[in-house]
């Protein structure tokens, strides 16, 4: 894939292909592991006319057409010993973290419903982003107070069983404006098409981690004192579904102390889900496989012959271009779907 640029140098626009670089793009939907940034390392140029960033003077958009690997360069690191310059920036998703969703004046929460594209257009977004029309809708949804557009939109689309894709795509006659389009799409269940395992092929590295210290019993402690304190017991069944029905002998047991909450059950369920999500982690490094953020894939442990469905929540794309030689590598992180 070719990494392209659109540069604005004091109002003079130019565009083209980046050459001779090492790039690392990190994109994620994981609210507990928010990266969504990139680095591009190049040799120091011989003149400032070749720079791709200079504060208040040079702005540059980089992108791989039709993918999420792109964004705005927002900084640079110059190493005179190595004679290199490393450009840093936020991916398209990363720009969503720069904006805050606030409740409307006089209201406790921002509450929305209806067409998802219409809703997104009413939220604070970067001027580099546009929202494509969609037929997807949502019922009544309440945003948390004062959260980033990234977190709010991610939760909104998850609730609607949808996902988003952000990228620059050109069609005949289009101008190189540097505007990326947000497209709302269904979550793609690829478990019947894509299975990864240790014996998949020579191009895959699979790491499956299981934490057997994940609690099977969570005691949630809320408001009140001593015998009057609110206490809720939550359990995980054999399939790690959260239930309130007591399971005799369930262990390990943990305590969740949240005396400030007025919604102990919902907060306790949320905390328990976070713990369970960390019970099984699957990291995949693979080449030549069509996977995108939000896809559901199947992963098989060769030793136990156990299959689990996992959602792609993080993709790292690494690319090196040495002129006559080019390499690409993808690393995927997942969360097990239950």
Segments from the language model and where they lie:
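Oligomerization/assembly interface segments of phage tail-like spikes and tubes
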Residues: 29-47, 82-94, 220, 274-285, ...
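Short beta-strand-centered interaction patches in the first periplasmic/extracellular domains
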Residues: 77-96, 133-214
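Short coil-to-beta transition motif at edge beta-strands of beta-rich domains
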Residues: 49-62, 289-300
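Acidic, small/polar-enriched beta strand-loop surface segments
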Residues: 4, 186-322
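Surface-exposed cap/loop segments at beta↔alpha junctions
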Residues: 47, 54-131
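Solvent-exposed edge beta-strands and adjacent loop segments
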Residues: 1-33, 197-208
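Amphipathic, non-transmembrane alpha-helical segments in extracytoplasmic/periplasmic proteins
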Residues: 40, 89, 102-130, 144-171, ...
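Short beta-strand and beta-hairpin "edge-sheet" elements
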Residues: 59-89, 298-329
């Amino acid at each position: 894939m070719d990494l392209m640029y659109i540069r604005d140098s004091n109002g003079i626009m130019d565009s083209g292909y980046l050459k001779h670089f090492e790039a690392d793009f990190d994109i994620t939907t994981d609210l507990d592991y928010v990266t969504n940034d990139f680095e591009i390392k190049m040799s120091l140029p011989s003149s400032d006319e070749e720079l791709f960033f200079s504060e208040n003077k040079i702005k540059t958009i980089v992108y791989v057409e039709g993918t999420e690997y792109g964004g705005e360069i927002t900084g640079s690191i110059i190493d005179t010993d190595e004679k290199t310059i490393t450009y840093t920036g936020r991916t398209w998703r990363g720009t969503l973290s720069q904006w805050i969703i606030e409740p409307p004046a006089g209201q406790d929460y921002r509450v929305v419903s209806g067409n998802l594209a219409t809703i997104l257009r009413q939220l604070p977004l970067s001027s580099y982003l546009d929202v494509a029309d969609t037929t997807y809708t949502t019922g009544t949804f309440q945003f948390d107070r004062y959260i980033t557009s990234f977190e709010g939109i991610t939760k909104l689309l998850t609730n609607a069983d949808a996902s988003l894709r952000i990228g620059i795509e050109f069609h005949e006659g289009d101008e190189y404006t540097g505007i990326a389009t947000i497209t709302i799409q269904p979550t793609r269940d690829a478990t019947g098409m894509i299975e990864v395992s240790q014996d998949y092929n020579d191009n895959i590295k699979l790491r499956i981690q299981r934490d057997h210290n994940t609690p099977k019993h969570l005691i949630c402690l809320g408001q009140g004192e001593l015998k009057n304190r609110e206490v809720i017991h939550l359990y995980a069944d054999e399939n790690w579904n959260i239930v309130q029905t007591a399971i005799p002998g369930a262990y390990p047991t943990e305590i969740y102390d949240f005396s400030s909450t007025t919604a102990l059950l919902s907060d306790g369920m949320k905390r328990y889900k976070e713990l369970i999500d960390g019970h099984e982690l699957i990291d995949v490094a693979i080449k030549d496989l069509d996977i995108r953020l939000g896809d559901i894939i199947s992963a098989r442990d060769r030793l136990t012959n156990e299959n689990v469905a996992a959602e792609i929540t993080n993709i790292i794309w690494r690319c090196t271009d040495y002129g006559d030689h080019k390499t690409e590598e993808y690393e995927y992180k997942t969360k097990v779907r239950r």
